[in-house]
Amino acid sequence: MFSRPFVTPVTIDLQVKSITAGNMWEGLGFYKPANSKSNQMICSKGFRLNCSIDREMIVITKALVDSIAERSSETYEPGLSTVVMNFENEFDPYEAVSTPIYQTATFKQPSATVNGPYDYTRSGNPTRDALERLLAKLDKADRAFCFGSGMAALSAVSQLFENGDEIIAGDDIYGGSDRLLSSVIPRTGVVVKRVNTSDLEEVASAFGPATKLVWLESPTNPRLQISDIGKIAEMAHARGVLVLVDNSIMSPVLCQPLELGADIVMHSATKFIGGHSYIMAGVIAVKGERLAKEMYFLQNAVGSGLAPFDCWLCLQGIKTMELRVEKQQKSAQKIAEFLAFHPRVKKVNYAGLPGHPGRDLHYSQAKGAGSVLSFLTGSLALSKHVVESTKYFSITVSFGSVKSLISMPCFMSHASIPVAVREARGLTEDLVRISVGIENVDDLIADLDQALSSGPL
C-alpha cells in the first residue's frame, strides 16, 4: 500500500532580525530556506508534500498542522470554521485577509536557467495552492487537488489504472459517475464490477487478483443507502486495493472518509464547498506520498486543474460551509419527518430517520445525515406534479446550494442509466430528490404539503 506519514510538521513565522541567539532555532530543528526573502522558518523533521521547481513532489510541506500551539496540544483540535477562518496565505507578502486571485497564465522567471516557484498556472498557481492546502487540512489528507469539475477529478483517478485492472464500484451512485464507469473507463481495458456496497458479502465476493480500486458513495445518490467505509477499507487493504469515497453529499463538515480508512476522497466542490451554484469544481484528497505524486502528475499532464478565479470562489464559499451545512441539515431533518408521516408519501430515504436501515452505521462514521433526501409517492403523475408545483424549490440537477432544489433523478441526473438497469437497482421513476437550502423550513414544509395535497389521486 501507499506509505502514510507518522508525524505532522509545523512552520513558524519569525522576525529573524530579533533573534540574537545565533543557532537557537536551528537547534530545535528549524531552518530558513536558502535564498528565501521571507522570514519563514520550516521544520526539517516533518512530512510534507509540495511541488518543487521541476514539478516533482518533495517532502517539505504542512497540510495538517500550522502552528506549534496545535502540535503542543495534540488532543485539541479547533472547529472547522475556526480552521477555515484562520488559515494563512503563506505566499502573500501583504497578508491580505481575503486570499488574492493570481489571475495569470504564466509567471516571470528570475533567469533563463533558474525557475521560480511558479512558471505556468496549469502546473501550479498560488490561489489554487491556497485552496488545495486548506482542503487537505479539512479532509485530514496529505494532499488535495482541485479540478474543473467533480467528473474531471474522478476521471483523473481512473487514469491511475490500466488495461486488465479491475474496479469494484457501487451500483447506486451519481448518474455522471455511472456513465464514466459504464461507458468511458472500459474503453481503456479496465474492467468495472458493479455491486451493492451496503452488502459486505457482495463486496467481498467481487474481489479478484486484478482488483485495484473500490469506488463507493455513502450515503448513495439518490437512494441514500449506507456503506460501511471502515470495513470495506479493511477488506480492500488486506488485498492491496485502494478505496475511493465520493463524499459530495456529506462534505468535509459531516464526514472524513480518510480517517475511516479510505485512500482517496472526492468532493464535487460545486455542491457544499462552493455552496451557491456559481462554481463547477471537483476535489481529490489523498493519503500517502506516492499517491499524491501520481495525482499531481495527472493534474499537471492532463491540464485539468481548477482556474484561479474559480479557486477564489471556492475559498469564499468554504468560509460559510459549516454554517450552511448545519442550517440545511436541521431543516432537512424536519422535512424528512414531515414527509415520513404524509399520507401521499410511500417511503422517505434519509439516514436521519429512525426507520432507516443504515442509520446506526451512518452515525458511527458521520456527524449528521446531511440535507439531501429522496422520497417515493408510488405514482409518476403525482411525483411530477409535486416537482412542478412547488414555489420555493427550483427544478434542477445538483445539490448543496443555499437554494432548495428538487428533481426527478430518472429523468434528470440519472437519465443516462438505461431503464432496465435503473429498474433492476430499484431506482424507480416516481423517485423525487430534494436538496434543502437555507430558506425558512416552515415555508418549505408548507410548500411541499400543498404540492402533495393538490396532486392527482
Curated annotation (Swiss-Prot):
- Listed SUPFAM superfamilies: PLP-dependent transferases (SSF53383)
Can you tell me what the entry says about the temperature dependence of activity?
Optimum temperature is 50 degrees Celsius.
Q: Which UniProt keywords apply?
A: Amino-acid biosynthesis, Chloroplast, Lyase, Methionine biosynthesis, Plastid, Pyridoxal phosphate, Transit peptide
Primary location: plastid
Known EC number: 4.4.1.13
Q: Tell me, which GO biological process terms does this entry list?
A: 'de novo' L-methionine biosynthetic process; transsulfuration
Q: Which InterPro entries match?
A: Cys/Met-Metab_PyrdxlP-dep_enz, Cys_b_lyase_euk, Cys_met_metab_PP, PyrdxlP-dep_Trfase, PyrdxlP-dep_Trfase_major, PyrdxlP-dep_Trfase_small
Q: Name one GO cellular component term.
A: chloroplast
- Asked whether the UniProt record includes DNA repair among its keywords, one would answer no
Q: What Pfam families has UniProt attached to this entry? A: Cys_Met_Meta_PP (PF01053)
Using the UniProt record, name the top-level EC class of this enzyme in a single word: lyase
Which positions bind pyridoxal 5'-phosphate?
120, 122, 150-151, 268, 270
What Gene3D superfamilies is this protein classified in? Aspartate Aminotransferase, domain 1, Type I PLP-dependent aspartate aminotransferase-like (Major domain)
Q: Which cofactor does it need?
A: pyridoxal 5'-phosphate
| pH dependence per the entry | Optimum pH is 8.5.
A Gene Ontology molecular function term for this protein is: cysteine-S-conjugate beta-lyase activity
**Family stated for the protein in its record:** Belongs to the trans-sulfuration enzymes family.
User: So what does this one do?
Assistant: Catalyzes the degradation of cystathionine.
NCBIfam families reported for this sequence: cysta_beta_ly_E
Q: What is this protein called?
A: Cystathionine beta-lyase, chloroplastic
* Native source species: Mimosa pudica
